[in-house]
Amino acid sequence: MSSLSSGPQDTGGSSSSSSNGSSGSGPKAGVADKSAAVAAAAPASVADDAPPPERRNKSGIISEPLNKSLRRSRPLSHYSSFGGSGGSGGGSMMGGESAEKAAAAAASLLANGHDLAAAMAVDKSNSTSKHKSSAVASLLSKAERATELGAEGQLTLQQFAQSTEMLKRVVQEHLPLMSEAGAGLPDMEAVAGAEALNGQSDFPYLGAFPINPGLFIMTPAGVFLAESALHMAGLAEYPMQGELASAISSGKKKRKRCGMCAPCRRRINCEQCSSCRNRKTGHQICKFRKCEELKKKPSAALEKVMLPTGAAFRWFQ
C-alpha cells in the first residue's frame, strides 16, 4: 500500500515538479523573447535615426534616399472610416450617398448657370435699351438746340429789319426836302432827293442815311471827297453863305486831279511845251499832263457834283 501510495505521490510530485518547472521556465522564456525583440528593434531604430549615406552618381550629384514618410506610407484603405472587414455593404452605401451628393451638386450648379445666363441676358438687354434711350435723348436735345438756334436767328433778323425800318422813318422825317427849303435849288435836284429816298441807288446801304454819293470821287489812287461838294450840306439852310463859300473855295483852293484821264496817267514831262521851257517864270505843269477835269470851270464841277443820286460819277462817262 505504501508503495502504491508512494507511487502516486511520486507521480504527483513529478507532475507538480514538472509543472512547476514548466511554469518556472515559462516566464524566463518570455523575458528572453522580449529582450530579443528589443535588441532587434533597437538596431532598426538606430538605423532609421542614423543619417543615410550620401550616394553620388557619375556626375557627382547627390542622390538622396526617399523620405521616411514616403517609405512608411500606408494604403488608402487604412485611412477609410469603414474597415476592410467592415464590409462591402458600408462601402456601397458610402458610394451611393456620394453619388447622390455629386448629382445634387451638379444639378445646383446647372441651375445656377441657367440663372446666371438669364441675368446676363437681362443685363445686356438693359444696357442696350439704356444705350438706345441715351441716343434718342441726345438726338432730341440736338433737335431742340437746332430749333432754338433757328428761332434765335429769325428773331435777330426780325429785330434787324425793324431797326432798319425805324431808321428809314426817322431819316425821312428829319431830312429837309429840297422843295420845302426853297433855297433856290432847281426842281431837278428836289426830284433827285425824292428818288434817293424812295428808289434804288448805286449805294443800297446808304439809302437810309442823308449822304449823297455824288460827294465821293473814285480814282485808282483811292476814294476822295469832292472839295466843292463839302459845302452842299449848308446850301439848304444857308444859301448865301454856301454860295460865298463855294466861290471862295473855287478861287483860292487848289483842285485835285481826277487820276483817270490820259494826262493824269502820264508820269514824265514832255520837256518841249512852253510850260516845260519856261518853268522858272510860270511854274506851270506840262501841258500834256494837265487834267481834263481841271481845264473846266469850277462852276461846272459844282453842277456835276449836284447830279441826281442814281447818276453819280457821270463825269467819268
From Swiss-Prot:
Subcellular location: Nucleus; Cytoplasm
Alphabetical GO biological process terms: negative regulation of transcription by RNA polymerase II; regulation of generation of precursor metabolites and energy
GO CC entries: cytosol; nucleoplasm; nucleus
Record motif Nuclear localization signal, residues: 252-257
Source species: Bos taurus
The organism's place on the tree of life at top rank: Eukaryota
Cross-referenced InterPro entries: CXXC4/CXXC5, Znf_CXXC
GO molecular function, one term: DNA-binding transcription factor binding
Keywords per UniProt: Cytoplasm, DNA-binding, Metal-binding, Nucleus, Zinc, Zinc-finger
Zn finger (CXXC-type) location: 251-292
Summary of subunit composition and partner proteins: Interacts with DVL1. Interacts with RBPJ.
Ranges of compositional bias, category Gly residues: 83-94
Entry-linked Pfam families: zf-CXXC
Binding site for Zn(2+) 2: 270, 273, 276, 286
Domain notes: The CXXC zinc finger mediates binding to CpG-DNA.
The protein's role, per its UniProt record: May indirectly participate in activation of the NF-kappa-B and MAPK pathways. Acts as a mediator of BMP4-mediated modulation of canonical Wnt signaling activity in neural stem cells. Required for DNA damage-induced ATM phosphorylation, p53 activation and cell cycle arrest. Involved in myelopoiesis. Binds to the oxygen responsive element of COX4I2 and represses its transcription under hypoxia conditions (4% oxygen), as well as normoxia conditions (20% oxygen). May repress COX4I2 transactivation induced by CHCHD2 and RBPJ.
Bias type Low complexity, positions: 1-49
PANTHER family: CXXC-TYPE ZINC FINGER PROTEIN 5, ZINC FINGER-CONTAINING
Protein name: CXXC-type zinc finger protein 5
Predominant location category: nucleus
Residues that, per the record, bind Zn(2+) 1: 258, 261, 264, 291
Recorded name of the encoding gene: CXXC5
Region (Disordered): 1-96
Keyword Chaperone among record annotations: no
